[in-house]
Amino acid sequence: MINTLWLFMFLIAIFSSLLQFLFNNDVEVFSLIVGAIFKNAQVAVEISLGLIGILSFWLGILKIIEETGIAQKISKKLSPLFKIIMKDVPENSPAISTIVLNMSANFLGLDNAATPVGLKAMEQLQTYNTKKDEASDAQILFMILNASSITFIPITILMYRAQMGALRPTDVFIPILIATSVSTLVGFLSVAIKQRINLKNKILLKWILGFVLFILLTSIGFLAVDYEKRLQISSIIGNLILILLIGIVMLTAIKQKVKAYELFIDGAKEGFNIAIKIIPYLVSMLVAIGVLRASGFLDIIINAIKYLGNSLNINVSFVDALPTAIIKPFSGSGARAMMIETMQTFGADSFPAFCSSVIQGSTETTFYVLTVYFGAINISKTRYALKYALFSDLAGIFAAIFVSYMFYSN
């Protein structure tokens, strides 16, 4: 599927640019497309090189975690669950603890920690993959959970809203939590049905119900806190947990009497190799995305939706937030820029700005995640991964729009 989509992204961009030229007399569109090719190819390399430092740091920390026995303890504790959802992964596999650490980092909104840990998890899952150029069921499930990962602390979005002058920047916290939970549940359940995972299993049901209960209690608890304290609490929790994790790893290394520094260096060396590996995959995808954006195709889609909504007498207030939704699967920075632009255009306390913020927090850069995660282990055949990841993204977008109408207040 990804091969066909990649080809069509270029063909659609060319067709769209011709329409812009013929009907809008846009003579600049062709130079914009060519400029996007060169710019995004350079950006892809810059992103990869920029990952080297953070990849090296977290892979070094992971090496210490593996050698101190922390990973084994986590794996042993969660093996009963993973035996159900990832049948090909052996009991007590180190991949289990790495997956848990990755999901925890995503959960706390710690993107810089989540990516390197996620890449390590994909490498570990690759050791159990019998078809090395094709994604396994376990890798697809992990990728979907990453692409739809629940965001418990959307600290960057709250900070942007505060900087743009929103009266109550944390108003989007609960809507984001609900929308991103819907995205995660839809992503997991759809893949579980595809992979014929037994959803009636008591252990799995307990985890799903526990997840729903946790989200519910968190929402209630957060609503009970004053507006002024919410942003501060969100920031403290995320950063404190990260610092405590590093502290626990170092203290355990002292207790176990392992050579932590040497282990860190060994693990950190892998960061450079992984960053270089993903360059061609990133170039291919980011150039295609850049060409599509420069062609004006996204504007055509937005205007068509607005026209259809008005024709059917539907409230189309959400349409002004759709640029964020359309761009987010392709580019995190692009979607963030769209969110900020929406705040500037309509006001930080407007409905489009509110909805745009919720969409930004409840969806993921699906194409980036898929490209980087599978590219790091040289997998070109992603099977049904993209289709199901986009499906969970779509569920997150619909949920974000729905809860925005529910929670928005002037």
What is the predicted function of each stretch?
Residues M1, P90, S97-I99, E134-Q139, ...:
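Generic hydrophobic alpha-helical membrane-segment signal
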Residues L11, W58, E67, F107, ...:
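Short glycine/serine/threonine-biased micro-segments
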Residues M1-G53, A162-R293, S311-L312, Y384-N410:
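Signature of multi-pass transmembrane helix bundles
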Residues V100, S104, Q139, R230-I233, ...:
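Generic signal for short, ordered secondary-structure residues
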Residues A113-A114, A121-R161, A166-R196, L322-N410:
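C-terminal transmembrane helix pair
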Residues E28-T127, Q256-T345:
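Membrane-embedded alpha-helical segments and adjacent helix-loop junctions characteristic
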Residues G35-F38, V45, P94-I96, K131-E134, ...:
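Hydrophobic alpha-helical segments, principally membrane-spanning helices and signal/leader peptides
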